[in-house]
A protein has these predicted regions:
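Beta/coil-rich, acidic/histidine-enriched accessory regions frequently appended to metallopeptidases
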Residues: 92, 128-294
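A broadly conserved amphipathic alpha-helix scaffold signal in soluble, globular proteins
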Residues: 11-12, 33
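Short alpha-helix carrying the canonical HExxH Zn2+-binding catalytic motif
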Residues: 2-11
Length: 294
């Protein structure tokens, strides 16, 4: 989406100002994607989100070829020119390189080595060395002399990667919005969430998605998209419609936690019905208005 693109490019602008020397492409793009996937709540970011689409793309690639990711030392040695030359005109390789860069930065920021020591201090040390003028590949080798162990741990990590709860709920609400849009375009205008669920179950609706070479279907049980992360149906106060414009589907408002709200609104572009899901974080000090999802 445009919002994710802006967050991604904003990091690149920040990096140009914050670092005296250019970051290697895997690190620059990996960090940019960490911010791309972050949830903006209106006044802060919720970082380190793992969206389901990333998991699908990465694990589908690994299932087809367990050696599909580049050797980490080779990845660290890529210059910006190498990176650009390799992915220009090759969408599949470009998608692969970006996903590997994202996964590696996420791994280094969030995981521990075999001795239980967080990798994050070493990632910060790597950034400092590059900023001090070390050649990126030399900085990588000095910070990660145990690259074979790192490679093995990273491979295990990406194989077991799972979506974060917040990102999973956001995707589910986006799928629910796709369902509501289909009902609306077929002349069915449910007055509330329960009517929408009954209409979808009665019509045995299912959606089909594709991203690159990866295809997936919506859950055959549409109740999934009316439920929380533990599979319990939301109450009508936690998940509801809010009518804004008569010519458009109602906004979908869902509160999944005390302070966070998902708010999906619909709009038209060129006669096509589109939607966007925003995340709002409410303050405990003020009245909580049920117009967003936690």
């Amino acid at each position: 989406t445009l919002r994710r693109t802006l967050q991604h490019e904003a990091f690149h602008q920040f990096a140009q100002v914050a670092f005296e020397h250019e970051l290697p492409p895997w690190l620059n793009e990996g960090l940019a994607q960490i911010f791309e996937e972050a949830i903006w709540t209106g006044d802060s970011f919720i970082l380190y989100q793992v969206p389901p689409r990333r998991v699908r793309l990465i694990q589908a690639g690994l299932a087809n070829d367990p050696q599909i990711f580049a050797d980490l030392h080779d990845l660290a040695a890529l210059t910006t020119a190498d990176w650009s030359d390799a992915i220009t005109g090759n969408e599949g390789l470009g998608q692969l390189r970006y996903n590997q860069a994202w996964a590696l930065v996420y791994f280094l920021a969030r995981q521990q080595d075999a001795n239980g020591n967080p990798y994050l201090p070493r990632l910060l040390n790597l950034l400092q060395k590059i900023d001090d003028g070390f050649a990126p590949v030399n900085a990588f080798d000095s910070v990660f002399p145990d690259v074979d162990e790192l490679q093995d741990q990273f491979f295990e990590f990406v194989q077991s990667l799972r979506p974060t709860p917040q990102a999973l709920l956001i995707e589910r609400q986006q799928v629910l919005a796709d369902f509501v849009a289909q009902l609306w375009e077929r002349g069915q205008h449910p007055a509330d969430i329960n009517q929408a669920r009954r209409a979808l179950k009665r019509g045995k609706y299912q959606l089909h998605y594709r991203l690159g070479s990866v295809r997936w279907d919506s859950d055959s049980d549409v109740s999934t998209y009316f439920s929380d992360g533990e599979g319990h149906l939301f109450s009508t106060s936690a998940l509801r419609f809010n009518r804004i414009a008569r010519q458009l589907p109602p906004d979908i408002l869902c509160r999944a936690a005390p302070r966070v709200v998902l708010h999906t609104h619909f709009f038209q572009i060129g006669g096509r019905l589109e939607h966007e899901t925003l995340v709002e974080q409410t303050s405990l000090q003020r009245k909580v208005i049920p117009t967003a999802l936690d």
